[in-house]
């Protein structure tokens, strides 16, 4: 826009699809569990394996559309997509129960922490802390950049 580079807006697919809108003040939702502010600096530095970001990708928002539970490991950027029935906390927990069953005794080494947003579909996720050593952190409300790796992958899924 400033004309500093020889690039047009049409060359930037992310910029073209975003509409600039006036900002509105939002009333923040309450954080469901442990805040992302309590996360260790070691997790922030991406030095250790086993710290995951989690989100949902919805289809075209019709009643029968597919929903994907996406998980991205912070250090290696390893990425999982799990198709779930719907956008409910019961479906999300069922997917995590299947993952726990699949990994068995290795679960605690692979999933040390999970960072997710404050959506109602993740309300029961803190129950994982009771049945395993996995710590669940909730991002700040309306701040998707708190879990940027998984959001980047989700953008690629939506594009293709």
Question: Can you say where each PLM-predicted feature lies in the sequence?
Answer:
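Basic, flexible linker segments flanking DNA-binding modules
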Residues: 1-45
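Short conserved beta-strand segments at catalytic cores or DNA/RNA-binding microdomains
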Residues: 44, 57, 63-80, 96
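Two-metal-ion RNase H-like nuclease active-site motif
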Residues: 49-60
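Mobile genetic element proteins and their domesticated derivatives, centered on retroelements
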Residues: 55, 71, 77, 96, ...
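Active-site beta-loop-alpha junctions of metal-dependent nucleic acid enzymes
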Residues: 60, 64, 81-106
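Conserved, well-structured core segments that form or line functional sites
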Residues: 88, 106-107, 111-113, 118, ...
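RNase H-like two-metal-ion nuclease catalytic core shared by retroviral integrases
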Residues: 116-119, 123-126, 138-160
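Short, structured coil segments at secondary-structure junctions
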Residues: 131-132
């Amino acid at each position: 826009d400033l004309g500093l580079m020889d690039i047009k807006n049409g060359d930037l697919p992310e910029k073209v699809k975003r509409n600039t809108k006036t900002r509105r003040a939002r009333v923040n939702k309450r954080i469901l569990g442990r805040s992302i502010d309590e996360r260790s600096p070691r997790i922030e530095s991406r030095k250790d394996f086993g710290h995951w970001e989690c989100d949902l990708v919805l289809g075209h928002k019709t009643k029968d559309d597919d929903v994907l539970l996406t998980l991205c490991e912070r250090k290696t950027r390893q990425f999982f997509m799990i198709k779930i029935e719907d956008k409910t906390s019961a479906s999300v927990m069922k997917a995590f129960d299947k993952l726990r069953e699949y990994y068995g005794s290795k679960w605690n080494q692979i999933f040390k922490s999970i960072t997710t947003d404050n959506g109602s579909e993740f309300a029961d996720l803190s129950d994982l802390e009771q049945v395993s050593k996995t710590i669940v952190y909730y991002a700040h409300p309306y701040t998707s950049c708190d879990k940027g790796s998984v959001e980047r992958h989700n953008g690629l899924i939506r594009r293709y």
